[in-house]
Amino acid sequence: MQAKVKPHPKFPAIYEAILEDGAQRLATKNLAPGRNVYGERLIRYEGVEYRIWDAYRSKMAAAILKGLKTVPISPGHKVLYLGAASGTTASHVSDIVGEKGHVYCVEFASRAIRELIDNVCMYRINMSPILEDARFPEKYSLFITGKVDDIYCDIAQPEQAKILADNADMFLKNSGWIMIAVKAQSIDVTKEPTEIYNREIKVLENRSFNVREVVHLEPYDKAHVMIVAQFR
């Protein structure tokens, strides 16, 4: 059986691939045909190339497979991505927003951003790499044009929710959305994960966010949750 691809029943620009053995995987339409980013499989179906989206490598994909009901990132959106690393999830976000959208990729590690530029951004017209620390959004405000529709945050910092909220105050439009992947051990190894998640949720609520969903990411990521919230 040839691999097949069909649109996801809920989320625009996200797809479901049915592989030769019947296994189902998430996929996105490849904005840079012929190139993969992290060794993911490329599938050609009805003249279009898709990239398999590995939920063990991407917390956003894991959250979708764990039943996330809201994925605010959509075609045409401007997205601020905090903690883009070498571009695994950011490249799929690039696929989703498409040529009419844009992804501003903030990353502090120089090695990671070199890989992001050389392997990803060079081949995608809708990505801007920014070598800066997400704790100081004022340092990169000149690189971001207007307000963004969404912020995606995946940074290993103790004050993750505060950092995201500081960025939202500066860059996120009213009624915009955020997705934040919280890793308990990055915040406090001495506390129970549930206590940490609740603390980060409280920070967001105190900073004008309406938390809509909290999804645990096991078995794809241990002691992680994905929080989806709307601003003001």
Residue ranges and their predicted role:
Residues 104-160:
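S-adenosyl-L-methionine
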Residues 74, 97-98, 171-175:
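Helix-to-beta-strand junctions that scaffold the AdoMet/dcAdoMet cofactor pocket
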Residues 68-74, 95-96, 144-145:
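Glycine-rich helix-loop-beta junction characteristic of Rossmann-like nucleotide cofactor-binding loops
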